[in-house]
Amino acid sequence: MEPWTLGLTNMFMARKDEMDATVAWLKEFEAGYDSGFADQGIDVLLTPVTGSPAVKLGEQAPTVAYDTLYDRVVTFAAFTAPMNVAGAASMSVPLSWSPAGLPIGAMFSGKRGDDQLLFELALELEAARPWAGRLPGIVAT
């Protein structure tokens, strides 16, 4: 078994008494997500897509030691995971580029079901900062 799979299994088994409380917290987060938009007068949230720059090939392979990989994944997915839990409408658009020419994503998230708002925003962003033709110096085919 790969270190990642074994590590996750061990972590969840060691914390199985916390599962009910964790599931309840996740459901509360999901339920409160949309109301936060109305309460704060927010249409769209803007965050980075990832918590770190693009990783090198193999840095997040399931064969990497569990503790190392866990820290990397938690940092990398810090912004996408909550949106997945909330069931939020989200999109990633490449609005910036690294010195190596790799895209840096900006994540826009709306209320659940607000896909149309995000598609309209994507059209405006693409018109203002076209990205369709931008490719890094090396492209895998």
Positions of PLM-derived features:
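Short helix-loop capping/hinge segments that flank enzyme active sites or metal/cofactor-binding pockets
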Residues: 1-34, 43, 48, 52, ...
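Structural helix-boundary/capping segments
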Residues: 20, 84-141
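Short, surface-exposed loop/helix-turn segments at secondary-structure junctions
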Residues: 20, 40, 55-77
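Small-aliphatic-rich amphipathic alpha-helix that forms the alpha element of a beta-alpha
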Residues: 32-35, 68-93
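Sec/Tat-exported extracytoplasmic proteins
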Residues: 37-41, 129
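Short, acidic Gly/Pro/Ser/Thr-rich loop/turn segments
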Residues: 53-54, 115
